[in-house]
Regions:
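Generic protein-terminus/edge-of-domain signal
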Residues: 1-65, 69-71
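A cytosolic small-molecule/anion-sensing beta-strand core signal
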Residues: 58, 74, 83
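Short beta-strand His + acidic residue motifs that chelate non-heme Fe in jelly-roll/DSBH
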Residues: 63-65, 87-94
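Short acidic-glycine-tyrosine-enriched beta hairpin
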Residues: 68-80
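Histidine-centered metal-chelating micro-motifs
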Residues: 79, 84-90, 109-110
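A hydrophobic/aromatic-rich effector-binding and dimerization subdomain
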Residues: 92-157
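Compact structured core domains
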Residues: 136-185, 189
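DNA-binding recognition helix and immediately preceding turn/loop
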Residues: 194-217
Length: 217
């Protein structure tokens, strides 16, 4: 199938997503995802998200393209999407998808504290081809947060349900924000170290006889 003939799948609610992957819908506005339990899935498609989505990839089972570049995700990475974003999905043949995550509709958080703060989670609008690489300890933290939300979804809906679900989603996103900041703070430090070493090598070069013998580096 040619790229321009790929189907455009609009994920405008969580039930639509669950039907595409053969998963159960427990709540109309939020769903905890376990793609290892999926019974069907598209192999090549464009996804247009009208919900928030966060995935913890357990294995690389395909490629995800956002804009013109591919995410650099591997095992144990997190990728996030916000309403209005379009991704290009290409699944590896004969490989079961394997990822955990959460989808939630903007209506779930509308009028809540999380709804007022959602834009601070900049990883939802991250426009490069980088995913969040997490440690095993961080992965367990994410899984614990997802489990808390799962337990709440299994509970009979009452007047506390929405507040508790939103609070636990907020907790999950706060942890992810910490992980993102750790990753990029670390990377910035590495970049600075490279620049310092490069400047040191240049100084050594120009302080010796190399410029006269070999010319400019």
């Amino acid at each position: 199938m040619e790229e321009n003939t790929k189907e455009m799948i609009v994920i405008d609610n969580v039930d639509r997503y669950n039907k595409i992957f053969g998963l159960e819908t427990r709540h109309p506005l939020v769903s905890i995802i376990d793609l290892a339990k999926s019974t069907t899935w598209p192999t090549r498609a464009w996804f247009r998200y009208e919900v928030y989505a966060l995935y913890l990839k357990n294995v690389k089972c395909g490629d995800i393209k956002y804009g013109r570049q591919y995410y650099d995700y591997q095992d144990g990475t997190i990728v996030c999407f916000a309403p209005g974003q379009i991704t290009d999905l290409e699944m590896l043949p004969n490989i079961q998808p394997n990822a955990h995550g959460i989808l939630f509709h903007p209506d779930l958080i509308r009028g809540t504290a999380l709804g007022q703060e959602i834009k601070k989670y900049s990883f939802f609008s991250y426009e490069t081809n980088e995913a969040l690489h997490i440690s095993e300890e961080e992965r367990q933290t994410v899984m614990d947060c997802l489990q808390k939300i799962t337990i709440e979804l299994e509970h009979s809906i009452d007047k506390h349900s929405r507040r508790l679900i939103c609070a636990n989603i907020g907790l999950l996103l706060d942890y992810c924000m910490r992980f993102y900041e750790r990753q990029f703070d670390t990377r910035n430090g590495v970049d600075k170290d490279i620049i310092v070493r490069f400047e040191h090598l240049l100084n050594e070069y120009f302080e010796g006889d190399a410029p006269q013998n070999q010319g400019l580096p």
